[in-house]
Amino acid sequence: MYIGELASLTGATPKAIRHYEKLGLLPVAKRKGNYRIYEEIDVQSVKMIRLAQAVGFSLSELYDLSALKYKNNRFPVEVAQQLIQKKNQQIIEQKKALNRLQEDLKQLEDEIIQTYITHKIPA
């Protein structure tokens, strides 16, 4: 399949796909003349790259996994699982921080009501 079809199947732009290749996240596509030719495995790879980005992984983090894959001739599942666990822990911490922020906003609102409405202090 050509890059346009890969793009439409994955939601990635052709420019993004070429960027993934340049970074080494995708193997360099075979060529037919001036056209890149992709395979079904590339569809899955691009979908995983996009999902990983959507959940907060940077392209450099993905590159590190990709480098290990090519170095060891197999995808580093254990390393990926560790990174996912770490990202999940970061999300848990972010949720806690957002909950604290929400509590602070409620406290601020309560203090404004207490000060300016209950005690009728001019604003």
For each of these PLM feature ranges, what is it?
Residues 17-18, 49:
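Short, hydrophobic-biased segments on the C-terminal half of alpha helices
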Residues 7, 21:
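The alpha-helix within a helix-turn-helix
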Residues 20, 33-34, 65:
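Residue-level "edge-of-site" marker
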Residues 26-33:
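Beta-hairpin "wing" of winged helix-turn-helix
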Residues 6, 13-16:
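Short glycine/proline-centered loop/turn elements that form peptide/ligand docking sites
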Residues 34-40:
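Minor-groove-contacting beta-hairpin "wing" of winged helix-turn-helix DNA-binding domains
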Residues 2-5, 27, 40-123:
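Arg/Lys-rich, alpha-helical DNA-contact motif
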